[in-house]
Amino acid sequence: MSGRGKTGGKARAKAKTRSSRAGLQFPVGRVHRLLRKGNYAHRVGAGAPVYL
C-alpha cells in the first residue's frame, strides 16, 4: 500500500501557436515546415522561422 490517495493527472494546457508565443502575425509553424521541405539546410533550428 503506497497511500498515494486520489491523485489526478495534470490537464493538458490549451494549445498556443508559436506565432502568438513570439508575438508575430505570420505563421511560424508554416515557415518552419517550408524551411525543412525546401532543402535549405540539413537541420533547421526552432528559432529559425521566428528570426526569418
Curated annotation (Swiss-Prot):
Modified residues (N6-(2-hydroxyisobutyryl)lysine): 6, 10, 37
Family that this chain belongs to: Belongs to the histone H2A family.
Subcellular location: Nucleus; Chromosome
Function of the protein: Core component of nucleosome. Nucleosomes wrap and compact DNA into chromatin, limiting DNA accessibility to the cellular machineries which require DNA as a template. Histones thereby play a central role in transcription regulation, DNA repair, DNA replication and chromosomal stability. DNA accessibility is regulated via a complex set of post-translational modifications of histones, also called histone code, and nucleosome remodeling. Hipposin shows strong antimicrobial activity against several Gram-positive and Gram-negative bacteria.
Positions carrying Phosphoserine: 2
Region listing for Disordered, in residue ranges: 1-25
Residue(s) carrying N6-lactoyllysine: 10
N6-succinyllysine: residues bearing it: 10
GO BP: any one term: defense response to bacterium
Organism name: Hippoglossus hippoglossus (Atlantic halibut)
Name this polypeptide is given: Histone H2A
Source domain of life: Eukaryota
Single Gene Ontology MF annotation: protein heterodimerization activity
Keyword annotations from UniProtKB, A to Z: Acetylation, Antibiotic, Antimicrobial, Chromosome, DNA-binding, Hydroxylation, Isopeptide bond, Nucleosome core, Nucleus, Phosphoprotein, Secreted, Ubl conjugation
PTM annotation, UniProt: Acetylation is not necessary for the antibacterial activity.
Cellular component GO terms, alphabetical: extracellular region; nucleosome; nucleus
Residue ranges, compositional bias (Basic residues): 7-19
